[in-house]
């Protein structure tokens, strides 16, 4: 019998899931793409499709879900959560009966059927015509502008809604029947909603009673809390994918850092005191009294995919493309040739210089010179990771499992289970125990020197 945590992360285009042991070994990993356009039920079907792939001898000790935000899911007033099992059994046999004599397969099918009536409004869906974020009196909230946009786009659905959930809380609700909003830290309340912001948006923008809007939004609970159970398996309040990745890369003590790179890229460093700099973003850490300073490189991976497509490659053929690009000789000054390899070399050098500027900004502000733990799809490209190290002059650490969100989910679940599974450790120590480094990408001294000279010459002429 293998024991572990079932972790799931709701992405924009796919759901990733993993079964992670208490020692950080990933025994199973799944990635299920969503259809386009994606619906709420597609999230649910992908979650249970990944669940069903687990062998019968895998004992799930807890479930923890992270996801993108601020996506909104409306559950209608006519919805009734299926009876959730209180069985103590942790194995995955569908034949194990739930409370009331309903077996697990029937329970799952009932949840999927109910989800067909729920409405998803993704975080990146365009605002309805005539509405701008700046026009919504939402303060610092990331969610209230999306709720206002949802109200404008789907007024009838909004009027009939019983609850509005973000992604992780929605799936957790379907599993447990517990309607909650998971708060990473009390300092994040303003980024979700404060009562004064709710009242102002309800009365001056939505033109509804403030109590109506307040009633739609589930109450806050602390991330890492056991909010209920699914067939006797504890379900832990998860966090947004950004926070999960910080946990799963160990960016939880002052001076630790990560490079989370997929379709876009975010450099992060944990700092002891709040400090700001131009072109950086300051947010609370999930660890009390600590902070996270970020530098974001928008669409880094997406732009590279578009570049590949424009040159006849598949948009995800990164490794083959990098093999050709790295064969192009380095040019210290002047233009690269008008070939795929030449223009590709120019593209990735330019991208790495942007990353270097981001590292510079974080380090000058924080006073740390950290090793950056890698997370995300770009971490799997060896040639790119080494080139990034050479061009930026930084060291990058590659974990054995580079999907930091899922390791973060596992750490949060073990923390939520308490002393029995968390071994009495705090969240930072649990995460450190789960993260195992496979290799380090360190800058080659000679290459780093010539890239530094080129970078400085570009900076002087910029």
Q: Where are each of the predicted segments found?
A:
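Gly/Ser/Thr-rich active-site cleft segment
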Residues: 12, 135-242
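Glycine/Thr-rich phosphate-binding loops that ligate phosphate moieties of nucleotide
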Residues: 1-32, 65-133, 156, 269-280, ...
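N-terminal phosphate-binding loop and adjacent alpha-helix
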Residues: 26-58, 133-137
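Short glycine-aspartate micro-motif
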Residues: 3-9, 60-66, 164, 234-248, ...
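Alpha-helix C-terminal capping segments
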Residues: 248-254, 414-417
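Short beta-strand-loop/turn "lid" adjacent to the catalytic site in phosphate-handling enzymes
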Residues: 55-123, 139, 163, 168, ...
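Phosphate/pyrophosphate-binding loops at sites that engage ATP/ADP/AMP, CoA/4′-phosphopantetheine
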Residues: 47-62, 153-158, 202-211, 358-370
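Short coil/turn connectors at secondary-structure junctions
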Residues: 2-3, 117-118, 159-162, 214-217, ...
